[in-house]
């Protein structure tokens, strides 16, 4: 670490921050200080009424006030100061901004902006919306990122961090929830009015409420009140989450060195939910299937709820207590929450073996695309936030993990604690984080990290035998990308004269020579796979490395294989050389390494067609059947998490491609059993079986799937079946699409059904005919976030004719939907890249399959 401290001081590569623009934000001369919101809500009504009072401080004379609203009907807008009242006229501007004027200048001072309005309870999973379950309606909210303005007028920006006070009237039979404890509750003529305590300062996107006939169970062991609320009749399915939440919260309090900062902690299982969960202050909302895993779920069903709960509770500090100043730093929230959740899983639940999971691998693929934007980018509208949203989580988390590995966990934790203390109840920017990390570690963290967060992609680091090291932007073969440079601290493992040693160097130019790297038998350039870069070494070193695989950890073995796959896709490694890596690692016995082999084999799917599918099936069987024979199809209590996951992935790939009788019989049996008597403990294997059966299934099978789907009350069962409706052929496809558009499939799940069916059709023409006819209806049903991404869900292809078909559709219609043009740009570029790769490797791949089938 001392060496790193010195070399970090020499960092020279930086990227200038983007210039801030404010045409899409309200004026900074008027600042909110407090907001009261009074709502009248009924889950059985499609509209609601509201009154809000926004307390404002006007710093300089202005001609108008500005606030946000979207889809609301403003009935009265007045400005108050003491006993004086001025009616205001309101004109809509861009970006949902409203200009309110009294007709005269507004002098500096304190004012109250009072607005009476009506709004709509939608069913598309954003704003204030309704979910339906078992014949009952439930209102919940999703205000991140720019959807609070759909429920109440206000300063809907993350740096407008103020206290709120909510008052909600609703029919007496309903449970009414919000961010804070109830202050008082009055009931008159069957209508309750619930007054909630004032909140701590928070941004508008964290305001939340829920109304419905909820059941609940207490969250055990908390120092503050807390319950899990579920749709009626499902509270007992929340017991696992209820009994694990307190230990998760205690871990986070210990790490941050301060107690949970709010007065209560409630969870709500929401039947219709676009994302996984939402970290609303004191009222965290989740997709039902995440929270409702029963009392004692099997090991395979535990990691998702634990991880998601940890992520959301980490947000109580990262994001809620300390909030990013604007949406261009959303990664500060999401990356830190993901980082903390993974650390917690390693420390608190080692049985899930998070230590061997490579988060960077989730980011490398999308980050390599020529269309990818930086994590820190200009954000004007909601579609900009969602553009590349996943990299806020995965790339951001990978970068934080890398920083921690470089400066040490103690220094990292000290910086986090200082950051939380300094910016509590305030907003922060990335530079604020870099400053405290630099102070705690005595290393210039910011100079390096800006090169990764303020420009897209990452470096490919190339080593030569003479110690020369070069860097250039990693990209897929044939892609046209600009030249870029990064500051790359490299932690190396190398073998020389029979001894394995570690070495740390700093690559801060496009090309440098390091004499310490000469005459090595091999160099492994990414110790413990902590760094965020790809690498290439001379072929003779790679050959020698494959003879020394026992010298590497599980993380390093997995990263070696994934790195080789990346080099193949970039045209930086030949097919034969890549297969030598794959074949060597396929002999490894560790289940985590074996699962990476399965993943890479599945990555060949873009090269599979009707002519070589049978040969590929035989090839996959030859590499994996021994695992199938050893692991079987039944999850056992004594299995490790890695064994469980390997069983699932092996069976998933074999059942899709292999004609092995035992495999196909197992798929039919598992599918039949699950459809007739779905059990959560068999869900993971059943999911693979159902997908395998569907791709060969007929009308009778589809009828069985639909019957099981419509008769189940279990969100997890529904999720499995919905994602397995990948039936082939026009007739079955149209039947599934009709199902997707019906009330059987809720708006948040509609695109998962449509994507599953669209991506498996041999003939794309009928699907695009359907999409062209039904796009408007589809866009009205699904969440806005899904509308922008329709091309990415259904139009990724590796066929030039299909790309042309999609292009004809989107060139005519995408402009009518915010963000869809960008969505098609991403999907089209990805598809064209796939065509390029297919042309490059198809002949070689077919020859390899032929040669492999001839080897006995």
Model segments located where?
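N-terminal, polar/Ser/Thr-rich
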Residues: 18-49, 75, 133-138, 158, ...
């Amino acid at each position: 670490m001392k060496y790193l401290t010195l070399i970090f001081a020499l960092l020279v590569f930086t990227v200038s921050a983007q210039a801030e623009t404010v045409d899409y934000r309200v004026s900074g001369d008027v600042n909110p200080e407090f907001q009261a919101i009074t709502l009248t809500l009924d889950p059985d009504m499609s509209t609601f009424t509201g009154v809000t009072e926004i307390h404002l401080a006007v710093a300089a004379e202005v001609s108008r006030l500005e606030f946000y609203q979207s889809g609301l009907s403003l009935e009265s807008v007045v400005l108050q100061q003491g006993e004086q009242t001025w009616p205001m006229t309101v004109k809509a501007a861009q970006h949902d901004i409203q200009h309110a004027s009294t007709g005269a200048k507004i002098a500096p001072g304190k004012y109250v902006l009072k607005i009476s309005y009506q709004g709509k309870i939608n069913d598309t999973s954003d704003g204030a919306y309704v979910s339906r379950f078992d014949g009952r309606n439930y209102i919940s909210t999703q205000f991140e990122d720019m959807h609070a303005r759909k429920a109440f007028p206000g300063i809907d920006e993350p740096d407008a961090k103020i206290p709120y006070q909510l008052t909600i009237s609703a029919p007496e039979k309903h449970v009414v929830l919000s961010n804070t404890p109830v202050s008082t509750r009055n009931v008159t003529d069957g209508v309750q009015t619930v007054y909630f305590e004032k909140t701590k300062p928070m941004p508008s996107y964290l305001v939340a409420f829920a109304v419905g006939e909820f059941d609940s169970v207490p969250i055990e062991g908390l120092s503050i009140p807390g319950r899990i609320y579920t749709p009626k009749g499902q509270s007992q399915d929340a017991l696992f989450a209820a009994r694990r939440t307190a230990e998760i919260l205690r871990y986070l309090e210990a790490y941050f060195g301060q107690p949970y900062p709010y007065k209560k902690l409630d969870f709500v299982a929401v039947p219709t939910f676009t994302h996984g969960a939402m970290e609303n202050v004191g009222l965290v909302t989740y997709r039902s299937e995440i929270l409702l895993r029963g009392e004692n779920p099997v090991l395979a069903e535990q990691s998702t709820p634990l991880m998601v709960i940890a992520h959301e509770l980490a947000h109580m500090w990262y994001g809620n207590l300390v909030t990013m100043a604007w949406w261009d730093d959303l990664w500060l929230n999401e990356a830190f929450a993901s980082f903390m959740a993974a650390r917690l899983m390693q420390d608190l639940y080692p049985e899930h073996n998070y230590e061997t999971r490579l988060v960077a691998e989730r980011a490398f693929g999308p980050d390599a695309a020529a269309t990818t934007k930086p994590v820190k980018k200009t954000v004007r509208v909601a579609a900009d936030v969602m553009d590349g949203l996943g990299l806020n989580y995965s790339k951001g988390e990978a970068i934080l993990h890398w920083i921690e590995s470089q400066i040490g966990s103690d220094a990292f934790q000290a910086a986090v604690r200082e950051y939380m203390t300094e910016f509590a109840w305030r907003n922060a920017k990335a530079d604020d984080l870099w400053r405290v990390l630099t102070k705690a570690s005595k290393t210039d963290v910011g100079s390096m990290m800006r090169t990764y967060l303020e420009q897209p992609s990452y470096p490919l680091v190339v080593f030569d035998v003479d110690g020369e090291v070069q860097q250039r932007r990693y990209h897929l073969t044939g892609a046209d990308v600009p030249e870029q440079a990064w500051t790359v601290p490299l932690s190396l493992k190398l073998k020389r004269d029979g001894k394995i040693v570690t070495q740390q160097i700093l690559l801060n130019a496009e090309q440098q020579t390091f004499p310490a790297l000469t005459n090595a038998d091999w160099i492994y350039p990414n110790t413990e796979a902590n760094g965020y870069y790809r690498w290439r070494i001379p072929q003779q070193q790679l050959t020698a490395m494959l003879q020394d695989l026992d010298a590497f950890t599980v993380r390093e073995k997995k990263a070696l294989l994934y790195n080789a796959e990346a080099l193949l896709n970039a045209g930086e490694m030949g097919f034969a050389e890549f297969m030598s890596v794959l074949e060597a690692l396929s002999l490894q016995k560790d289940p985590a390494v074996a699962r990476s082999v399965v993943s890479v084999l599945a990555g060949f799917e873009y090269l599979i067609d009707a002519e070589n599918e049978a040969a590929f099936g035989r090839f996959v069987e030859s590499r994996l059947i021994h695992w199938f024979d050893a692991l079987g199809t039944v999850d056992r209590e004594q299995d490790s998490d890695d064994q469980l996951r390997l069983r699932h992935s092996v069976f998933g790939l074999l059942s899709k491609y292999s004609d092995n009788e035992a495999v196909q019989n197992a798929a039919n049996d598992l599918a039949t059993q699950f459809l007739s008597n779905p059990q959560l403990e068999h869900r993971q294997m059943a999911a693979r079986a159902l997908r395998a059966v569907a791709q060969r299934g007929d009308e009778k099978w589809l009828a069985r799937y639909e019957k099981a789907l419509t008769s189940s009350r279990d969100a997890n069962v529904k999720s499995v079946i919905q994602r397995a409706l990948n039936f082939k052929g026009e007739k079955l496809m149209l039947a599934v699409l009709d199902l997707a558009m019906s009330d059987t499939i809720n708006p948040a799940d509609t695109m998962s059904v449509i994507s599953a069916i669209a991506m498996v059709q041999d003939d794309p023409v009928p699907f695009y005919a359907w999409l062209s006819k039904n796009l408007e209806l589809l866009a009205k049903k699904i969440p806005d976030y899904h509308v922008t991404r329709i091309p990415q869900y259904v139009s990724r292809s590796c066929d030039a004719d299909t790309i042309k078909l999609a292009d004809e559709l989107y060139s005519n219609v995408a402009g009518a939907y915010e963000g869809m043009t960008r969505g098609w740009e991403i999907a089209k570029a990805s598809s064209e890249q796939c065509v390029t790769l297919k042309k490059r490797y198809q002949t070689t791949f077919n020859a390899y399959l032929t040669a492999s089938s001839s080897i006995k």
